[in-house]
Amino acid sequence: RLGAASSAELAAFFALLTPLEARNWVKARIATSMPRDDSTALIEVDVESADGSRPFSALARADLLEQLEQLPAPPKRLRVLSPFDPVLRDRSRMQRLFGFDYRIEIFVPAAQRKYGYYVFPLLAGERLVGRIDMHRDRSRDALVVKALWWEAGIRPSKARRQTLQAE
């Protein structure tokens, strides 16, 4: 589910291993010491950062290329992501991979919030394009948008707004 990650990111994601245990698990599964067709074999890969800075080293399943070839094209829809989506949990990873600085602000005092209490990231294809603060009004059986922010470089075109409305 992570695609490519460091041993520390694996430990944090699964929350079952210490970083040292994860590092030892990874060492035992590097493809040079295991058959490449073993589903737990790992390879070392370089991953490009969203900002174009130097690539960072990560680990991936040895069958990564085969997995990538089988992936469907990203959906054309605009997706509203849960703030608790696994890809959003690690803020530094999120920033590095997507150039998206995200923080759920439910525990931040209202006066110190940058966006809002419960803001949802917006995903278009492979890019995080904005954030939306919305809630359900049960009395009207409606979804109420309190605020919408597009990321830098994203044009809030009529087509984009229609795509969001359809979601």
Put a short name on every predicted segment.
Residues R1-E167:
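Long, charged, low-complexity, helical-prone intrinsically disordered regions
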